[in-house]
Amino acid sequence: TVTGVQTCALPILKEEVQVEFLQQALDMILPKFDGFNLRMRTGVFWYYFEENGKKAPKVTEEAMFPCRFIRQNKNRNYLFRVTYYKSRINLEVFHVLTDGMGGINFLRELTYQYLRLVHPELAEKEGNKLSGDTSLSREDSFVRNYRSSKPSGFNKEKAYLIKEDKLPAGEFGVMHGRMPVSQLKKVAHGYHASLNEYFIAVFVWSVYKELLHGMSGGKPIRIAVPVNLRPYFDSDTTKNFFVMVSAEFRPQKESYTFEEVLACIQSSLHSQINKEHLEDLFSYSVSNQRNLLMRPVPLFLKNIAMRIVYEKSAVANTTTITNIGNIKIKDIYQPYIEGFSAFIAMSKGQYLKGTICSYQDTLV
């Protein structure tokens, strides 16, 4: 079985990683996280999970590009991978396990346990237990909050796609930019915008000016924006619980100003990021899963249908920009951690994506 990695998150420590302690830390915390201690099996009608039960996957030094396929039979059947490079710990996760919040939840505890092993004085103060604010909930919050009325689908209209020079097949390029959160907030608030709105508008503005050369007409520039549903529906699940909305800019005249582009992005997001619309989006997906006519359809036919849907929906967005938010670390561990960064894998038609996260006053 071949599984694509979709999320990679990495803490940067203030000292080089000692692989034997990182492996020991993973061995210790994995049994506590049922959502990671899984393997995926193929049935006649659907894929399904079962408890893995094998030893934790082997921690190795980073030697290849990130976000590669995870071959389960070469990874003790696990759907995540832990590697390291110098002072950096890498966690790569297949999105069927969890979303960005669930991944950070696991990575934070892995880092804490590693630091307690390397620095026994931390273990004396903290013990080898999970933090009180770490969730282990595996509730299916989609099903709990599902409502059957007014389901709505997803935009399938083709968006403007960036078709510049690409890296050779199999390669993956990452660029990190680091900026003070406090200064960025001042700039964004000067435009009466949130950080997310500001960054999305800057990306759209760049595409509009540099690739469309400020011309009108043509396909819309559309940005897929993951929305964490937990704050809207009182959930702390470590399962996937997010939906995608799309921030759209459709140039209908020449020479838009940045402020006009930003206003379009804000209007697009504000019309979608509300509890009722978010319910409609995930209720559409849940209703498809509950469709009694679909249940007896063999898996290979479902895979063909899903591939067609995926290819159409993939080119409905120019790119994806996800904001993991501020990564909070307990005070006692902060002196050992330099920072965090994260990124997501490429997908069909989207060869340039953005991931935002922050730690203390540094945004990456």
Regions inferred by a protein language model and the residue ranges of each:
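Non-catalytic, low-complexity flexible loops and terminal extensions
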Residues: 6, 85-88, 97-105, 109-186
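Short, exposed "boundary/linker" segments that immediately precede the start
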Residues: 1-3
